[in-house]
Amino acid sequence: MTLLALGINHKTATIEVREQVAFTPAELAGALAELKSLPGVNEAAVLSTCNRTELYCVTDSQGEREVLDWLGRFHALPPETLMQSAYHYLDGEAARHLMRVAAGLDSMVLGEPQILGQLKEAYQLARDNAGLGGELERLFQHTFSVAKQVRSETGIGENPVSVAYAAVSLASHIFDDFGRARALLIGAGETIELVARHLREAGIRGLTVANRTRERAELLAHEVDAEAISLGEIPQALAHADIIISSTASPLPILGKGMVESALKKRRHRPMFMVDIAVPRDIESQVGELDDVFLYSVDDLQEVIEENRKQRAVAAAQAESLIEHGIQHWQHERRVRGAGDLIRRYREQGEALREEAERQALAQLARGEDPEKVLQRLSRQLTNKLLHGPTLRLREASGEARHDILKAADTLLIDPAASTQDSA
């Protein structure tokens, strides 16, 4: 069995490619079923966020090309598009990659906590849809344990910084009097909730939350002291917003160039600052062509995020050390489990020899033979049968100068304690 991790992320692919490869929430269960139905794929899980799409599989062979081809077919993409951006890892390197992702070490914002929650959702989806077997189940559980250890034992999670924080930080640098600005947030998920809290902490004046379901918008608005509206009310609210930050799971853009042009006229062309965190994008790229609009995507937040990365370099080094220890533990346990089948077959062989010797001894006792002689014969028979096969193979190994086998046999077959007692 081979463990495979394959995907693209913000370091290997542009936002245009990432949004083409992203799975919508409605697609995930079906995609997982398709992936697991591929020949040789025994277990599978799918992670899809604004910054990465990754597939984790247990396969009969390496299988990375088959999985990559499937990813392209699912999204109707030419092979060369993915070939230029995709990466893959096998076995120990795949496990290391997953643990680094879970700990936030592979994120755009170093140490950001949201990815662990997103990984847990991917794990739960795979579990609910029969995607997991023993191998991925154990790997994910161990990964979550290592990620928790990283967060509790290093400074990687201190002063939480995320894409949400980076967006608010950029906005606060652009507006001289942030306390007089008004913000419109589109979406009501975890990222927008973080944006709302960061905006409140930064002293934003007015805050409006728009969401497809008004009830969810009202729930978040109540928590952050904001106004709640539906998506249908955005055209009216847009004219009053200085800052617009959007992060939904919509497959189609929510803000178009015409809608924003209309809002600018009502604002008498006062500038609008927009950050589109969504993948696929919520704001049409043509909106950025308007003179009074400053439109940023998640990729544009890199400068703010890079400063954060420098501040967390020491914590990251500590985290890498913990992950390395976690990898070694996982590999040890995997090797132990790998010997399980060999141990089972060896014990079954020994049990078969014991049963045969016992059957013969009972038959001899039933015929009235001397019990002491029967026991002596039984012990000799068991000893000879148990040692016959290994003895032959040791002689063959010696004749072929297979010193590796002889050395392993010495470790496996000779009990040092027994040898010491014999010499005494």
Swiss-Prot record:
UniProt keywords, alphabetically: NADP, Oxidoreductase, Porphyrin biosynthesis
Q: What is this protein called?
A: Glutamyl-tRNA reductase
Keyword Ligase attached: no
UniProt lists the gene as: hemA
Q: Where does substrate bind?
A: 49-52, 107, 112-114, 118
State the EC number(s). Answer: 1.2.1.70
> Which residues are named in the active-site annotation?
50 (nucleophile)
- In the record, what lineage is assigned to the organism producing the protein? Bacteria, Pseudomonadati, Pseudomonadota, Gammaproteobacteria, Oceanospirillales
Q: Which organism is it from?
A: Chromohalobacter salexigens (strain ATCC BAA-138 / DSM 3043 / CIP 106854 / NCIMB 13768 / 1H11)
User: Which pathway does it take part in?
Assistant: Porphyrin-containing compound metabolism; protoporphyrin-IX biosynthesis; 5-aminolevulinate from L-glutamyl-tRNA(Glu): step 1/2
Family per similarity comment: Belongs to the glutamyl-tRNA reductase family.
